[in-house]
């Protein structure tokens, strides 16, 4: 009875962490909306790049496939979050293609085809693996690698913040959402004993803490600089 109660509690904690992760991830998925409102208003993609949305779609589709019962077990929350994420990214890509120039249209359509082709190869290839454990390792490593590279992308922004001593290019709520989502899925992976979930999200959690710490440090410094009286005051 004690073992049953423990397993039930573990399952409940996993579900709570997964639901929280889905909620925080939704905040990330809607974050590009102001950019696309501007694109639609100006009927131009200007200098914006569509590559982040292509890569995000690829990442969501790989992780979605990993979450299915064909690959792993008890990962329904991974399926929901990545289904929603893939839908958002696909909508962003379609809007980008509609409002960009002809050259970029062809480029984005080509990349979109590559994404679906790569995912198709991964799905078809993994289904050819008869052993469930080997299949889990194969797709798990791909999913883990994809997530790690996605979480590593803010390293450029972190370097920029340190170099410029400004948090202008690192929005607080985006960093907070990333940290909360990563921390939630870190717990989800731990409760589910899934190394391919808790490892990349553990890295994401650490990077999220670094971003928030840098934001607090440099934001406080910028406020102090603004409120500091100048040594020489001139009156005109």
Curated annotation (Swiss-Prot):
Which GO terms fall under molecular function for this chain's record? sugar transmembrane transporter activity
One Gene Ontology CC term in the entry: plasma membrane
Q: Ranges for the MtN3/slv domain?
A: 18-103, 138-221
Intervals, Extracellular compartment: 1-15, 72-76, 130-137, 192-194
List the keywords (alphabetical). Cell membrane, Glycoprotein, Membrane, Repeat, Sugar transport, Transmembrane, Transmembrane helix, Transport
Q: What InterPro entries does the record tag this protein with?
A: SWEET (IPR047664), SWEET_rpt (IPR004316)
Q: Which domain of life is it from?
A: Eukaryota
**Segments in the Cytoplasmic topological domain:** 37-50, 98-108, 159-170, 216-236
Q: Where in the cell is it found?
A: Cell membrane
Q: Does the keyword Iron apply?
A: no
Glycosylation site residues? 7
TM annotation in the entry: 16-36, 51-71, 77-97, 109-129, 138-158, 171-191, 195-215
Leader sequence residues = none
Give the membrane topology, semicolon-separated if more than one.
Multi-pass membrane protein
Give the multimer and partner information: Forms heterooligomers with SWEET17.
Q: Which PANTHER family match?
A: BIDIRECTIONAL SUGAR TRANSPORTER SWEET2, RAG1-ACTIVATING PROTEIN 1
The family assignment reads:
Belongs to the SWEET sugar transporter family.
User: What this chain does, per the record?
Assistant: Mediates both low-affinity uptake and efflux of sugar across the plasma membrane.
Q: What is this protein called?
A: Bidirectional sugar transporter SWEET2
Tell me the organism.
Arabidopsis thaliana (Mouse-ear cress)
The organism's taxonomic lineage, starting at the top: Eukaryota, Viridiplantae, Streptophyta, Embryophyta, Tracheophyta
Record gene name? SWEET2
